[in-house]
Each structure stands twice: as C-alpha cells, then as structure tokens.
Curated annotation (Swiss-Prot):
Matches recorded under NCBIfam families: PRK00110.1, PRK12378.1, YebC/PmpR family DNA-binding transcriptional regulator
Keyword Ribonucleoprotein included in the entry's annotation: no
Example of a GO biological process term: regulation of DNA-templated transcription
Keywords annotated in UniProt: Cytoplasm, DNA-binding, Transcription, Transcription regulation
Matches recorded under InterPro entries: Integrase-like_N, TACO1_YebC-like_2nd/3rd_dom, TACO1_YebC_N, Transcrip_reg_TACO1-like, Transcrip_reg_TACO1-like_dom3, YebC-like
Family, similarity comment: Belongs to the TACO1 family.
Native source species: Herpetosiphon aurantiacus (strain ATCC 23779 / DSM 785 / 114-95)
Disulfide bridge map: none
Gene Ontology CC, one term: cytosol
Name of the protein this chain belongs to: Probable transcriptional regulatory protein Haur_3030
Keyword DNA-binding: yes
Subcellular location: Cytoplasm
Length: 252
C-alpha cells in the first residue's frame, strides 16, 4: 500500500475521518460543486458528479446539502464560484508533495498552504516543480468480505482493463488509466462488488523512503495540509512501512 491510499488508512486509524464529519461534508460538497461546474448538474450525464454524490450519500450527507452544492456549481445559487488549483512542493527530506485544492480565494488558499509547508519543514514550490514525478490515475477501492475471492476480483479487474490490482487485508485497490476510471468502475459494479471509492489519484513514478523522524515530519505536514478547509487531497512520493504507519497512527 502506498501513496494516497496509505495516507487515508493512517488517517482512518487515527480516528480523524470519524471525528470530523462536518469538515468531510465541506470537502465532499466542494467536489460536487466543481463536478457540476465542469460537467453540468445531471449525474446521469456527469460521471464525476455521480461519484461525488454517491460519496456524499455514503457519508449520510443530507439531500439539501447535496442539492445546494450542485446549485452552486451550476450557478443557480449565486454563490461565489469555486475553482480547482494544484500546488506543489517539497517536504522534509526532499519528499515531493502535491496538494489539490478547491477555492473561491486563491490568495487565502496559497497563504495557508505556504504556512503549513513552512511550519513543518517543507517548501512550497512553483507549478510543475514536482508534478512530473507523478502519473494521474484512477483508483477504485473494493471492500473485502469473507466471501471475497481476491483472485476472482483481480481477474475481473484485468478483464475490465485495469492497470494494476493491490490486495490488502480489508480492501482491494484497483488502479486504472484515469480516462478509463468510469468504464472499469461500472464493469466491476455490475459484478456486484462493493466499491467504497472511485476517484482520481496521483501515483508516484518513483517512491522514496525516509527514516522514522523524517517520515513522521512528512506525515504531520500532510495532516496539517489536509486539515485546511480549501484542501481536497494531498499526495506524496513517500513510502511508509506498515510498522511506521501503525506507530504514527497510535500517536493520536
């Protein structure tokens, strides 16, 4: 397990994902708004919007909140428009970090992100400074149950034109070309598999390791970044061992 998937697992173990429903809803609503702005307000015609709405419903977000987010994206509500912005920089030890944000005020967002980097041993770089180190991919997470046959799921994913399949204890992670995410996700869904996540991810072309102290510094930086309201996702090329991930998560 690596990249954003490992980071998400660390956050889950720390209980952060359960503690901050309001913040999660804010980020999901921004996903919905951006998707509606880019592809229109119909989930039947807009795959990204459909995924965002499914994520919102899975997190028990009220229907009114979902509709308000759609209305903001399509311009019905009259609220300030959101735009997607990507920031790039380096964490401690030269680890590459990419930050996806959704904002209605670039100056506020870049100031908050720069402060997070500076206070946690990192440096905010220029656009393109580390982006070349990553590939944009589709990520599908399938929940494992007692009845799940990893070999069968792997074959189904490959038949659906997936790039790679990683089998973990509680989930099976499927990577796809980003352009094929919708098709692969729908093909797996038709097989009755329980898909918990289908989203864009940034997959590092080359991963880097760091000692324990540096690893924890980088994870703290990523945590501070992801806690910012405008930040949607944080990626890095840091490889974290299961042992260090567990140790960091236990810090609370």
């Amino acid at each position: 397990m690596s990249g954003h998937t490992k980071w998400h697992e660390i956050r889950r173990k720390k209980g952060v994902l359960d503690q901050r429903r309001g913040q999660r809803w804010t980020k999901i609503a921004r996903d919905i708004t951006i998707a509606a702005r880019e592809g229109g307000g119909s989930p039947d015609m807009n795959f990204r919007l459909r995924l965002a709405i499914e994520k919102a419903k899975a997190d028990n977000m009220p229907a009114d909140n979902i509709q308000r987010a759609i209305d903001r994206g399509t311009g019905v509500s009259g609220e300030a428009a959101l735009e997607e912005v990507t920031y790039e920089g380096y964490g401690p030890g030269g680890i590459a970090v990419i930050v996806d944000a959704a904002t209605d005020n670039r100056n506020r967002t870049v100031s908050e992100i720069r402060t997070a980097f500076n206070k946690n041993g990192g440096t905010l770089g220029e656009g393109g400074s580390v982006g070349w180190m990553f590939d944009i991919k589709g990520l599908i997470s399938i929940d494992r149950t007692e009845k799940t046959d990893p070999d069968e799921v792997t074959l189904l994913a490959i038949d659906a034109d997936a790039d790679d399949v990683i089998v973990n204890d509680d989930a099976i992670i499927v990577y796809t070309e980003f352009s094929k995410l919708a098709a692969v996700r729908d093909a797996l869904n038709e097989q009755g598999l329980k898909i918990s996540t289908a989203e864009k991810t940034m997959l590092a072309k080359t991963i880097m390791e760091a000692d324990e102290a540096t690893t924890f510094q980088i994870l703290r930086l990523m945590e501070r970044l992801e806690d910012l309201d405008d930040v949607q996702k944080v990626y890095s090329n840091l490889e974290v061992s299961d042992e260090l991930a567990e140790k960091y998560a236990e810090q609370g």
